[in-house]
Design a protein with these regions (language model features):
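Ligand-binding loop in jelly-roll beta-barrel domains
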Residues: 85-110
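Conserved short histidine dyad/triad with adjacent acidic residue
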Residues: 36-50
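Short strand-coil-strand connectors
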Residues: 31, 67-71, 94
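Histidine-centered active-site/metal-ligand motif
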Residues: 49-51, 55, 89
Length: 125
């Protein structure tokens, strides 16, 4: 791999994917892990879903309500969390936008291309 393909900026680039209305991601895939910079607009919802990948998240900007395994957690800039495989999770913003850095291991293969939706994740009921 060239140096150019190994260095990125949080504010630009990546593979663009609309996860839900008002929830947009820029994805940076690697061999064994994947980073996703997710911008969640005010009063938007990331549907509760589950997938086989472990996921870590860091709230970079703003605040939101993170729902994990049926429990609501108020997260603000600087907070981070771990979501084990197959645990239902999602969230919603309040009056301001939120930016979250998600880390997936292994990478979510369906996120290696631009598109929309949550890929092969199972929507929780």
């Amino acid at each position: 791999m060239s140096d150019e393909s190994c260095f990125h900026n949080l504010h630009e680039g990546g593979i663009v994917r609309q996860l839900a209305a008002g929830v947009n991601a820029r994805i940076f895939p690697g061999v064994n892990a994947m980073l996703s910079v997710v911008t969640i607009e005010p009063r938007s919802v990331s549907p509760v879903h589950a997938h086989a990948n472990e996921q870590w998240g860091v709230c970079l900007e703003g605040e939101w309500i993170r729902i994990q395994d049926g429990v609501e957690h108020h997260c603000k800039a600087g907070d981070f969390w771990q979501t084990p495989p197959h645990v239902p999770h999602g969230g919603r913003t309040l009056d301001t936008r939120c930016v979250v850095l998600d880390i997936f291991a292994p990478p979510r293969e369906e996120y290696r291309q631009a598109g929309s939706g949550l890929g092969d994740a199972t929507l929780a009921r």
